[in-house]
């Protein structure tokens, strides 16, 4: 028996076997969790259904976090299969492509700012609102952030602001939901070569710099993040809430890589 045996967890954001959400689902399944999944549109539905089968699940629900109706419907449908459940993984982020290239000040638009915050940050709150009536005591909510929430990252631009908003939401939600025993945390993951990351300019250079600078001198994997996520959603982490847990091979603690000899 794994430490998530008996837990029911909804996983969002699964788009490929390179997705962080895939690594999370894999680790959670290995620890005994029962999983459900969401998909954004008809194009992704067959792919997510195949992944769901891989993880022994037949619960695959549509979810477009851009609309409140879709969010409400998702959890209403989930409740027909699970009257109560133990948490969800919010692995959702988006900004228009023109917001992720070059000079932030010149690239920024009102609409781009709105979309980035709506999809990447507000959606976490909206999902918690809709899920709240169906959550078991001691449930755990988990989202995914990035170091751009704390530092200026080239080409990450408006997503730096959106992730900062997401991390603030994590703390405020934790304070609010804590009285019901519900924990809320975020993982700030190091850069991983995912479909989402492919939209960031010079991402290969970012990975190279990361590997040279991180305390462990390596990049992180979806397995690294998945194992940490499984722990945070388990009763082993019962005293942890409102935290931003860095799973980044120690990159965030360093100021520069090795200087070498003069």
From Swiss-Prot:
CDD domains: ENR_SDR. Pfam families: adh_short_C2. It is an enzyme of class 1 (oxidoreductase). The record marks 201, 204-205 as: Involved in acyl-ACP binding. GO terms for molecular function: enoyl-[acyl-carrier-protein] reductase (NADH) activity; identical protein binding. GO terms for biological process: fatty acid elongation. NAD(+) binds at residues 13, 19-20, 64-65, 92, 163, 192-196. Pathway: Lipid metabolism; fatty acid biosynthesis. Inhibited by 1,4-benzodiazepine and naphthyridinone derivatives. Its EC number is 1.3.1.9. Substrate binds at residue 95. The keyword Lipid biosynthesis applies. Keywords: Fatty acid biosynthesis, Fatty acid metabolism, Lipid biosynthesis, Lipid metabolism, NAD, Oxidoreductase. It catalyses: a 2,3-saturated acyl-[ACP] + NAD(+) = a (2E)-enoyl-[ACP] + NADH + H(+). The active site is at residues 146, 156. Gene3D superfamilies: NAD(P)-binding Rossmann-like Domain (3.40.50.720). Belongs to the short-chain dehydrogenases/reductases (SDR) family. FabI subfamily. Catalyzes the reduction of a carbon-carbon double bond in an enoyl moiety that is covalently linked to an acyl carrier protein (ACP). Involved in the elongation cycle of fatty acid which are used in the lipid metabolism. This is Enoyl-[acyl-carrier-protein] reductase [NADH] FabI.
